[in-house]
Amino acid sequence: MPDEAISILSQKSSDSGLHIQLHPLALLTISDHITRHAARSQQGPIVGGLLGQHNGREITVEHGFECVVEIGPNGEAQLPNEWFVDRVKQFKDVHKVPALDLIGWWSTAPPSGPTTAHLPIHRQILQNHNESAVFLTFHPSQVQGASQSQGKLPLTIYESVYEGESVTENGKAMQVDGEEQLLNIRFRELPYTIETGEAEMIGIDTVARTARNAAATETSTVAAPSSQIDSDKQEQQPANTDLLSPEEEELIASLNTRLNAIRTLESRISLIKSYLSSISPSSEEGQKDSATKPDHTILRDINSLLSNLSLLTPHEQSAFSAETLAQNNDVSLVALLGQLSQSVNGMREVGKRTAIVNSVRRNRKQLGAQSRYEDDILGRDGVALG
């Protein structure tokens, strides 16, 4: 959307009492759409739809989706009506429990607020889909300073109202006698909070853990000579062998975490052993360092820790080992039976093929013997006629 258009932000604050609950999945969709649009150097407005629930004075923004934008006859941005209706219906079929509906749309806008360039699409959604649709604006110019603003997101959510052309700062319209008051769409900012479900927390945690392995690469559009490409490959081949894939880096990080945990556990066990040795009168360390006094609180904690070990280790180790061995034997037996079945099938195939070969050979021998017999008969008949 062009930033040089006229701002249509209302001078009056919202008095509707609406409150927006914004979910992270919608934010991820918006961020992904804007990032791909910028990475591909695409032109044109960035527009998307918002799905959620409208319960009284609370509106939830739970999901978002991208929208196709077409240019109207007067150069304004519009949504293809048939495509948009089908798209919303598809998302409603997917999100049936809980039932989600179209509650608004989103786009990019300057920090000063929506402009007249946003009105065509907003009017289209108000007239055809939702009379109380909200408008979420993302401010790309505030992305760099978002980390320095104590976590404030670079976005604003608005509701649309109809106001007269001449509205004072306190919200009262100035109407001239005998003149009809014209009503235009104005936007008022709404408060919002971030709400996160359990499934969203898992998804965001996965994205956060795998984001460190993401990297951007630039593709060159200029074709280099084949000789130069071969030489570059030969020079770069040893360097590429040292690079690790994202999966390998994640595996190394996981192994390092487990190694650090094991080292910490070992140090704690060594500390407990040294403490018990220092207070035990029967040990050499206890006789040398008799100044160490037993602490009953620490001893009770150690005793509780040792008692919990029995829950991890079975009481009857022999029975557990026998059961484990029996399970291993069952698995091995099933594997051997499978191999035996494959061997039997292979032997059957060999027997069938051998029978076919023997049958062909037998037929050939019979044909050869029959032909020799016929030749002998023909030879005898010729001698008799002569």
Curated annotation (Swiss-Prot):
Keywords recorded for this protein, A-Z: Cytoplasm, Nucleus, Signalosome
Signal peptide: none
Chain spans, region Disordered: 218-241
Assigned protein family: Belongs to the peptidase M67A family. CSN6 subfamily.
Quaternary state and interactors: Component of the COP9 signalosome (CSN) complex.
InterPro entries: EIF3F/CSN6-like_C, JAMM/MPN+_dom, MPN, MPN_CSN6
Native source species: Emericella nidulans (strain FGSC A4 / ATCC 38163 / CBS 112.46 / NRRL 194 / M139)
Lineage: Eukaryota, Fungi, Dikarya, Ascomycota, Pezizomycotina
GO MF, any single term: metallopeptidase activity
Residues of the MPN domain: 20-164
A single BP term in Gene Ontology: cleistothecium development
UniProt-annotated location(s): Cytoplasm; Nucleus
Physiological role: Component of the COP9 signalosome (CSN) complex that acts as an regulator of the ubiquitin (Ubl) conjugation pathway by mediating the deneddylation of the cullin subunit of SCF-type E3 ubiquitin-protein ligase complexes. The CSN complex seems to link protein degradation to sexual development.
Gene Ontology annotations for the cellular component aspect, listed alphabetically: COP9 signalosome; cytoplasm
Pfam families: JAB, MitMem_reg
Protein name: COP9 signalosome complex subunit 6
